[in-house]
Amino acid sequence: MIWHVQNENFILDSTRIFMKAFHLLLFDGSFIFPECILIFGLILLLMIDSTSDQKDIPWLYFISSTSLVMSITALLFRWREEPMISFSGNFQTNNFNEIFQFLILLCSTLCIPLSVEYIECTEMAITEFLLFVLTATLGGMFLCGANDLITIFVAPECFSLCSYLLSGYTKKDVRSNEATTKYLLMGGASSSILVHAFSWLYGSSGGEIELQEIVNGLINTQMYNSPGISIALIFITVGIGFKLSLAPSHQWTPDVYEGSPTPVVAFLSVTSKVAASASATRIFDIPFYFSSNEWHLLLEILAILSMIVGNLIAITQTSMKRMLAYSSIGQIGYVIIGIIVGDSNGGYASMITYMLFYISMNLGTFACIVLFGLRTGTDNIRDYAGLYTKDPFLALSLALCLLSLGGLPPLAGFFGKLHLFWCGWQAGLYFLVLIGLLTSVVSIYYYLKIIKLLMTGRNQEITPHVRNYRRSPLRSNNSIELSMIVCVIASTIPGISMNPIVEIAQDTLF
């Protein structure tokens, strides 16, 4: 009899939960329509993988790319709509969140064609790779729109778990296993630190989890200047510093970049930074509204450390992927300037604009590295010597992307940095901007060193890798080359295109 009553209660509780979930999906599902498209694409991939004995590779890539493009289209149709909070306050849709979601989708759309030939040549499992990429993209999109502490914790964990699996995708490679282990341990530690910080926010605000309600709770409890908030701020800064690869939480980055498959590195190098930047902006700007001076100071210190450490250590690297790892640490230091400047002086618009250019510059560089690695099997910088004599198109593409990363005019990277530094200067961040300018000059040095090697390698310096290099025809259906061409063109956009991009970015402000 007791078991029968308990069973009935369980059925009733399950029915209530199901009906509540159905009600939320029915009335709030339109707010996550782009995410639902990706979920539908994931289900299709799983169905095809489980029902078909022979994998139709082009069809799998078509489904993945189509779901990403359709999700981008859904975002564009929703542009300029009124901000809305859905799912009982867990998720918020506004222009600011949506443009970061657009950037994440753009990264994934460019990374999938960049990975096609690499996966086929290395004979890795294709369906699982696409599932992990789409799931990580989904986690990043939910993180951009997260409006409460639980979603802010769960969404990056969804992204991180897929990132761990992708970084160790080449299971027989010892370096890949080492990279995955370090990434997993450091990621778990940073997540624990974030949860500890959230517990301080939760307790200090009187049990609130929504971002805006936390602010109201801190006002009601008079705890907005308490030591607990300072502790939460420090722990959140450390946790987000890991996600963004900010010094001194950057130690995992070079090892993961070097050990992971190159297309995976290309994907992680941009999507993780875009998603974490969106989340950091909202967390610092809303719950820590009353501690703006404190978190400004903390981020300034981390930005300076990242710009100096990243660019100085990059000079000494012999591996192309490790060099780009340290370069990305310096690059995120520039992005932090936009977060510190904030809404008042166009900081968010400059940050978004620079991130758009950074995506094209970084993915273009990695596309060149993937092509060179597939044709030579090496990642050493010295092995690029004299590449121009064998493949001028690839050498010029790599040179343009590197020059744009360094910020030389008239390439896109120059105008992106110029606008970012100008906004920082107007906001009074003189020392931070000066450090940014000096470290940009340092970065130009090691980029030019590689370009000199590409163009002027003497015969005695050319390694067997380049001597035996097989150049592909100029017109090719190679998906990596197509992705590379798109990124190179976007990296060389002249400054005349800056104004419309900045104006669009201005519409994303709170």
UniProtKB/Swiss-Prot annotation:
GO-annotated biological processes: ATP synthesis coupled electron transport; photosynthesis, light reaction
EC primary class: translocase
Pfam family, one: Proton_antipo_M
Family annotation (InterPro entries): NADH-Q_OxRdtase_suN/2, ND/Mrp_TM, Ndh2_N
E.C. no: 7.1.1.-
A GO CC annotation given for this chain: chloroplast thylakoid membrane
Location(s) in or outside the cell: Plastid, Chloroplast thylakoid membrane
Domain of life: Eukaryota
Catalytic activity, as annotated: a plastoquinone + NADH + (n+1) H(+)(in) = a plastoquinol + NAD(+) + n H(+)(out); a plastoquinone + NADPH + (n+1) H(+)(in) = a plastoquinol + NADP(+) + n H(+)(out)
Membrane-crossing segments per the record: 24-44, 57-77, 99-119, 124-144, 149-169, 183-203, 227-247, 295-315, 323-343, 354-374, 395-415, 418-438, 482-502
Gene Ontology molecular function terms on file: NADH dehydrogenase (ubiquinone) activity; quinone binding
Family: Belongs to the complex I subunit 2 family.
Function: NDH shuttles electrons from NAD(P)H:plastoquinone, via FMN and iron-sulfur (Fe-S) centers, to quinones in the photosynthetic chain and possibly in a chloroplast respiratory chain. The immediate electron acceptor for the enzyme in this species is believed to be plastoquinone. Couples the redox reaction to proton translocation, and thus conserves the redox energy in a proton gradient.
Protein name as annotated: NAD(P)H-quinone oxidoreductase subunit 2 A, chloroplastic
Origin species: Manihot esculenta (Cassava)
